[in-house]
Amino acid sequence: MSAFPPPPIPAPDASRVARVEPTPDVVRGILELGDRARADDGVAPFNEQTRLLLGTEDGPALLVVQGTDGRPIGAAVAARGDGGIEAEIVVDPARRRRGVGRALLDAVLAEAAGSPVSVWAHGDHPGARALAAATGLDRARELLQLRASVAEARTGLGERPMPAGLALSSFTADDADDWVALNARAFASHPEQGRMTRGDLDDRVAEPWFDPALLLLARDADGRLAGFHWLKVEGGQAEVYVLGVDPDRAARGLGSALLAAGLDLLAARGLDEVDLYVEADNAPALALYRRAAFRDAAVDVQYRRA
């Protein structure tokens, strides 16, 4: 071991942030950077939609700070939508507290050119809170990650039969348009989920983790879709991916019945633990999940500047 300390790493400034094209090598480098951050922080810096859009035509802007070895030490993924810019930022754990995050956030603000900016901080990292405060971004939204034992969650729900007149089936390609329509109704006020298109659904169906048997549909006697429970199992980890109910059938026990049916599927497959994500201000959904013994595991925070 050397008796001499390593030389200090020069603090980058905004001039070192480069807007890069989404070549396969660039996308790979950003994803590997995200993996390093996830291993250190315990949470992924990019959400699923960002990962799906990376490298696509007309995808998000990619802003990168390169290290001396050519690998990115920081990156921002900034997507422009109707409400302005929405971004996610990641910094290599070994290069934090050296100005990389501030340089990237300044570059995102410049990219926005005065339009509203939203930045997600997955895991509510203290560094992200400090950076938001220093740049005038307000805490605008919280997304809770909840976790439960499959057995405890199922016990907590108790007997939850499907409401009369409804029957369960598994997803097929013929169900796609009905699912998109009901998802839009069930999540009409949700800024991301409610905007899912048929193309977005097709992208997820094409993912290696997708299993049609884990997308449960509840239909009435006339074939109308009343609700659904979509489960995701990847790498041995189960997730309540999305659970939706027709607003006309809200508060009638369908959500509880769908959750119970999904948990039964997970138990039959020998899965012990399940996660889910829910908006912190969604009181009805939180009440259901608390009854099912879900507990807080992490929180994602969206900071915003109007």
Swiss-Prot record:
Enzyme class: transferase
Residues that bind acetyl-CoA 2: 243-245, 250-256
Domain named N-acetyltransferase: residues: 17-163, 166-306
Organism domain of life: Bacteria
EC number: 2.3.1.189
UniProt: 1D-myo-inositol 2-(L-cysteinylamino)-2-deoxy-alpha-D-glucopyranoside binding residues: 48, 192, 232, 239, 277
Molecular function as annotated in GO: mycothiol synthase activity; protein-N-terminal-alanine acetyltransferase activity
Pfam entry (one): Acetyltransf_1
Record: residues binding acetyl-CoA 1: 89-91
Substrates-to-products reaction catalysed: 1D-myo-inositol 2-(L-cysteinylamino)-2-deoxy-alpha-D-glucopyranoside + acetyl-CoA = mycothiol + CoA + H(+)
Subunit: Monomer.
UniProt record similarity statement: Belongs to the acetyltransferase family. MshD subfamily.
Protein name: Mycothiol acetyltransferase
Provenance organism: Clavibacter michiganensis subsp. michiganensis (strain NCPPB 382)
Classification of source organism: Bacteria, Bacillati, Actinomycetota, Actinomycetes, Micrococcales
Gene, per the UniProt record: mshD
